[in-house]
């Protein structure tokens, strides 16, 4: 019999992470002046959860959290952007193999790697996936959705780069580094 890949801990993290993402997405965002495009603090939290629980959990937290936010606060999900949020969590989650914050290490090398990964994740999601799906699914005008994608992507890169780095660095400080304890005589 094949072992289930999602532990109970990961499933609980997906549920709680989705709820926190939804709340941060609604109450922790600032308008940019571009219609339906905000500066979102939720993506800093998504980055932490994706690094802790991996790509599948990162995808599901971003996807479910964004879908819940849209349904609860706006009436229906905007599926192209919901999917893009999942893509951000997925790509950052793959970075967990390079950035092991559970080992208590988040120094300059890991900070650089994290920011490189999150810039790629946000670029793919907001410059490519979200606007392209907007055009394919909703027949939105290309100039509008690519402008929204660029503004949203850049603001998410900056938000995750600043808040995400601070959040992850502080989390890593709570973990004990391997070999850091010495026996006293």
UniProtKB/Swiss-Prot annotation:
HAMAP family: UPF0397. It comes from the Bacteria. InterPro entries: ECF_substrate-spec-like (IPR009825), UPF0397 (IPR022914). It is a multi-pass membrane protein. The keyword Transmembrane helix applies. Its main location: membrane. It is found in: Cell membrane. Belongs to the UPF0397 family. GO terms for cellular component: plasma membrane. Keywords: Cell membrane, Membrane, Transmembrane, Transmembrane helix. This is UPF0397 protein CPE1584. The chain crosses the membrane at residues 11-31, 44-64, 71-91, 111-131, 149-169. It holds the Pfam family ECF-ribofla_trS. It comes from Clostridium perfringens (strain 13 / Type A). The keyword Membrane applies.
């Amino acid at each position: 019999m094949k072992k289930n890949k999602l532990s109970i801990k990961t499933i609980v993290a997906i549920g709680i992470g989705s709820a926190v993402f939804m709340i941060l997405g609604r109450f922790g965002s600032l308008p940019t002046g571009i219609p339906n495009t905000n500066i979102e603090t939720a993506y800093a939290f998504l980055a932490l959860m994706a690094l802790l629980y991996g790509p599948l959990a990162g995808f599901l937290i971003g996807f479910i959290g964004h879908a819940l936010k849209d349904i609860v606060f706006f009436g229906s999900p905007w599926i192209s952007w919901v999917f893009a949020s999942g893509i951000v969590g997925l790509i950052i989650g793959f970075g967990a193999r390079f950035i092991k914050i559970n080992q208590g290490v988040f120094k300059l090398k890991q900070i650089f790697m994290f920011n490189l990964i999150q810039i790629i994740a946000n670029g793919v999601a907001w410059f490519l996936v979200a606007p392209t799906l907007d055009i394919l699914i909703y027949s939105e005008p290309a100039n509008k959705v690519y402008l929204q994608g660029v503004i949203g992507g850049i603001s998410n890169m900056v938000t995750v780069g600043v808040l995400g780095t601070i959040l992850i660095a502080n989390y890593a400080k709570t973990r004990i580094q391997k070999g850091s304890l010495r026996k006293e005589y």
